[in-house]
Amino acid sequence: MNYPPSAELNDPFVGFLEGMGHNPQASLDFFDASTKADGKDLDNWDYLVAKGDNARAWPPGDDGTPLGHDALGHALESATIGIPYDSDATPPKHSAGSTELVNRIVGEYGKNPDRLDGSPLTDSLGNITAEYMRDVQDAVGGRIEVKTYGSNAELEALADQGQLREFLGAVGKDPDAYGAIVTSQQAVSTELINEVFHQRDTYGNVLPEELSNRVAPGAEIVGIMADSRTQAVYDDKIAADAEFNEGLATADKWAGRAIDTGLGRFPVVGDAAGWVIEDIREAVVENYTRDSSAEADMERDEFLATQRAGSASAMYDATYTAAIQAGMSEEQAKTMAGSASQQVKDSYGQGRQ
């Protein structure tokens, strides 16, 4: 299955992987199977993804990156999300097999984040992370259970060991991945906030504490994303702020998909769901976009501070709106929103540690 030994930049395996990218079940089965090579069983995962003696020697492209890694990312997207990688359809609920594969992906690249430096895989891994945002927030949260869309990827152990953080940090350096992750995080956090207000009678006097628990995981994730963006722009100089702004502007579908796959727990339907999606999109673009031309001389730490303030503002607005829609007074809504905003600032700092 290795590429032919010639001077031409080609790799016939790319076409095979692109085919897998359009066939979710075949792709999932493939990554869980093995192939006969020289009379030995060769695990397809070890051959294509893991780094070891049996790993594939990928031919480099003109830019020096592995020629087939973009196609590999498409195959992984298809296998984990359950629809062709370029489809906008609502995916099926996550299966035990797809969540197990996500766990392997996070573990592999979380242990070896340097393998994602400049990799064509990162945009696909960002899409996978956005799709599994509930699983990620469930792992990061610890104090609360975040219900997942089907089976749970069980990432908590990887979060405790630091591999989830390393994975997110490496993937978030890619502008498109950054946009997908930040947008999906805002959508899931908005859902969790709305849910707690519509169940406020259950929580009584501990409602503020429950609210803080629900906004903390998302805030920690955007803290990691801010660090990743800062490293990419200021330290590694591998991307410009304009590219990250574009990543945010083109990540709309992740707001819609996060809400579509959570509507059973979200107290809106029809046109109202469309309004929620638009609110999420606007919150992300308004609070995370940076005007590079006007702020070209902004220092690294100052930029991180503005991102922290933007994250807090986005969550303040989501909390205030949810509280008002749930029938709380304006004063109560402002108090709750202020509490959520402060929790975001605290948890954002944890994400940057």
What are these regions (language model features)?
Residues M1-Q353:
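Non-catalytic all-alpha helical scaffold/repeat segments
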